[in-house]
Swiss-Prot record:
Domain of life: Bacteria
Gene source species: Clostridium botulinum (strain 657 / Type Ba4)
Protein name as catalogued: L-seryl-tRNA(Sec) selenium transferase
Modified residues (N6-(pyridoxal phosphate)lysine): 293
Catalytic activity: L-seryl-tRNA(Sec) + selenophosphate + H(+) = L-selenocysteinyl-tRNA(Sec) + phosphate
GO biological process: conversion of seryl-tRNAsec to selenocys-tRNAsec; selenocysteine incorporation
Gene name linked to the record: selA
């Protein structure tokens, strides 16, 4: 059939609305939603005809496409996915998962009125920051604390408060890009601090900072390169040395430690990453870090340090523009409460638990998933193998975590096609592909995910 005839055969919306099956959907859904979905179905087939992708279609094809489109239009665009990549803090998949305590706290304050900015003891207006400030101080040892909506905002607010129209001295090797083309120099520019780069990419000495201090210097800045490592012939100035230099010239020292861990991972066999507590113990005046990376909480920028500097930031007009909402506060409070006991934090905060859980545990889980797939899915090959997971989220660069995975292949469908179908399934499953094998890393899977994975694999060849 030629293209013109195919286009003429496309049904009209008015005709389809008279059909019994469409009428059933009209009874359950708004007319606007049904008509829009019908139009999308017809437009789809018109496009396929014009591209010469089809040489025939039936009315039933159009109706079936309408049904799928209607269901998709009814569903929310922001949905849960199953992370089988083994990347624990997956930036594109929402970073850290919240602890049960944090989720319960969010639900409680979201479905009810709350004392967000109300002091129950005094019966007067209160501060939203008071709900978490004492907790942050308790788990970090800081004099004072406040929270904004992300770490870039925390850096911008701190720099704007400490050295607006003044100079911030930073090592050239620490001018990192934090993802999505957001760079530390650009954040500094918007804070209205003047960047002064010192040293070289791989080596910076204390005298590089000292030689650039003048009457217009506002802050000595140290940025932890949490998303990359420079190896070999390197040199950087320690926090202790910077604090001594700051004291000598009466300048505040600020450190952005990015991922912001409260747990010393070197105790568990990982490469040492600076903790918030260690930076404060060394005398750093202001420390900024993220809430949704190594902390395992919601997206937030946490600022801790000397009270005189934090108090100034609270009064900065930028603070209102950067403030967090009640749900973030509730999630952060629930997360921080877990940190009162480190063992409890590791058990209850999914991010910490996934990173620190042993390889042996995941071997048993991988074997369990493989058995369930083999017992329920035909025409696929499944095998358990050793592999490596990643921390992700711009944290612990170069660190790999031994794990076990289930590798999948089939003579009837390519690994790339399996990946695509799983990604586009009702409950999207995000996997890795390597050497024509699909890789399911159980480190980032929950037991509840196994049933869904089995059901989606059963549909792949249909």
């Amino acid at each position: 059939m030629d293209k013109k005839q195919l286009l003429r055969n496309l049904p009209k919306i008015d005709e389809l609305l008279k059909e019994e099956i469409i009428n059933r959907y009209l009874q359950e859904n708004s007319r606007t939603l049904v008509v829009d979905s019908l139009r999308q179905s017809i437009d789809h087939y018109r496009g396929e005809i014009l591209k010469n992708n089809i040489d025939s279609f039936t009315r039933e094809n159009v109706v079936n496409y309408f049904i799928d489109t209607l269901e998709e239009n009814k569903s929310t665009k922001f949905k849960k996915v199953i992370n089988a990549t083994g990347v624990v803090i997956h930036t594109n998949l929402g970073r850290s998962l919240l602890a049960k305590e944090a989720i319960e706290n969010v639900v409680k304050v979201s479905e009810n009125y709350s004392n967000l900015e109300y002091d129950l003891r005094k019966g007067k207006r209160g501060s939203r920051y008071s709900h978490v400030e004492e907790l942050i101080k308790k788990v970090t040892g800081a004099e004072a604390a406040m929270v904004v909506n992300n770490n870039a905002a925390a850096v911008m607010l701190a720099l704007n408060t400490l050295c607006e129209e003044r100079e911030a001295i930073v090592s050239r090797g620490q001018l990192v890009e934090i993802g999505g083309s957001f760079r530390v120099p650009d954040v500094m520019k918007f804070s209205r601090a003047h960047l002064v780069e010192v040293g070289t990419t791989n080596r910076t000495h204390l005298y590089d900072y000292e030689n650039n201090i003048n009457e217009n210097t506002g802050v000595l800045l140290k940025v932890h390169t949490s998303n990359f490592k420079i190896m070999g012939f390197t040199e950087e100035v320690s926090s202790e040395e910077m604090v001594q230099l700051g004291e000598k010239y009466k300048l505040p020292v600020m450190e952005d430690i990015g991922s912001g861990t409260l747990v010393d991972f070197s105790k568990y066999g990982f490469t040492y990453e600076p903790t918030v507590q260690s930076s404060l113990e060394k005398g750093v005046d202001v420390v900024t870090f993220s809430g949704d990376k190594m902390l395992g909480g919601p997206q937030a920028g946490i600022i801790v340090g000397k009270k005189k500097y934090i108090d100034k930031m609270k009064k900065n007009q930028l603070t209102r523009a950067l403030r967090i909402d009640k749900m973030t506060l509730a999630a952060l409070e629930g997360t921080l409460k877990c940190y009162i006991d480190e063992k409890e934090a590791i058990e209850n905060i999914p991010t910490l638990n996934m990173i620190l859980s042993s390889k042996d545990i995941h071997k048993k889980r991988a074997q369990r998933l493989k058995r369930r797939l083999q017992n329920n899915v035909k025409d696929f090959n499944f095998k358990v193998s050793e592999d490596l997971s990643m921390v992700g989220g711009g944290s612990m660069p170069g660190e790999r975590i031994p794990t076990y995975v289930v590798k999948v292949n089939s003579d009837k469908i390519t690994a790339e096609k399996i990946e695509e179908k799983l990604r586009l399934s009702k409950d999207p499953i995000i996997v890795r592909v390597s050497k024509d094998e699909v890789i399911l890393d159980v480190r980032t899977l929950f037991e509840r995910d196994f049933n869904i994975i089995v059901e989606e694999f059963k549909k792949l060849l249909k």
